[in-house]
């Protein structure tokens, strides 16, 4: 509960900086499944009703997740006011991160490369995304998929 209270105090800019720091620390040739969701409004629940629904699927996925070759990360995008703001100073996730227009969104990264994404993910979507890793690895190893080296090194 203390962690949730600390998140509430962070602005969207602070949260975006945390995401940027995490993204820059991804090691080469590693897989990360990032979940972007609304910050808690009051208490433990997000202001975003779709995020609350998706959290059940994400929770089930986390239980089955152990032993997979992908790291699960969760990122908050700020308050409802910050997310829905139409002002010049838009939410940094919308302004600086391509195509993050909805929450919740799940994005599969190979190092810093955005490989696959799903809006309002369900457990089957998350399992599918992680299953794609084997296919991507096979394509990379066979030379059929040429990932820009700047993303994986």
What is each of the regions a protein language model found here?
Residues 5-67:
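Local sequence-structure signature of Cys/Sec-based thiol-disulfide redox active-site neighborhoods
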Residues 34-40, 77, 109-111:
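Short loop/turn segments at strand-loop or loop-helix junctions that form parts
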Residues 15-17, 78-84, 124-127:
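A short acidic, often aromatic-flanked loop/helix-cap motif at beta-alpha or helix-coil junctions
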Residues 1-8, 153:
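N-terminal organelle transit peptides
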Residues 9-10, 37, 62-89:
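Thiol-based oxidoreductase modules, predominantly thioredoxin-like and allied folds used
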Residues 89-97:
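Short, internal strand/loop/helix patches
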Residues 96-152:
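Non-catalytic, surface beta->alpha helical segment in thiol-disulfide oxidoreductase systems
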Residues 47, 88, 119-122:
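Short coil/turn segments at secondary-structure boundaries
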